[in-house]
Swiss-Prot record:
SUPFAM superfamilies for this protein: Ribosomal protein L22
GO cellular component, one term: cytosolic large ribosomal subunit
Region (Disordered): 155-187
One record GO biological process: cytoplasmic translation
Protein name: Large ribosomal subunit protein uL22
Biased composition, class Basic residues, residue ranges: 169-178
Coiled-coil region(s): none
Amino acid sequence: MGRYSRDPENPAKSCKARGSNLRVHFKNTYETAMAIRKMPLRRAVRYLKNVTEKKECIPFRRFNGGVGRCAQAKQFGTTQGRWPKKSAEFPLQLLRNAESNADYKGLDVDRLVIDHIQVNRAPCLRRRTYRAHGRINPYMSSPCHIEVALSEREDAVSRAAPTDDAPAKKKLSKKKLARQKEKMMRE
């Protein structure tokens, strides 16, 4: 079993999945992972399916050099976006794997949220391409490692209603406290 970069806060209410040396572009997969971070599991699966069908785009924020603009990126507050099919399919498989792990653990699958997703560079694979005048250039690929951790969403705790017998005291600055003391001394 491999080591994950982050341990979940509540291991009993979370599940994990990972993939190593996946033959999919690192940069596109990084942007895909950042797009689905903190999403509920059901929404993330639906979103990645929509990306493969070009109904929703992946916003490109960090690795966006030369990336064209698309209207679908407006909903994410950016202008550049793409539909990286392979980079959407690999995390989708990992999410399904994590979902089956959660089902095996007896977690409520409908309440799962992507708590942690991380994409790291894997060692580059080297091939060659033949150029004019007998030269050879490298033809590299950039695979990646992906790890996902899902956790059950906690129920939001409502704030207690303020009681009338003890009004909340407002914190005063040092300057105002000094003025109040001065005023009390004069009286």
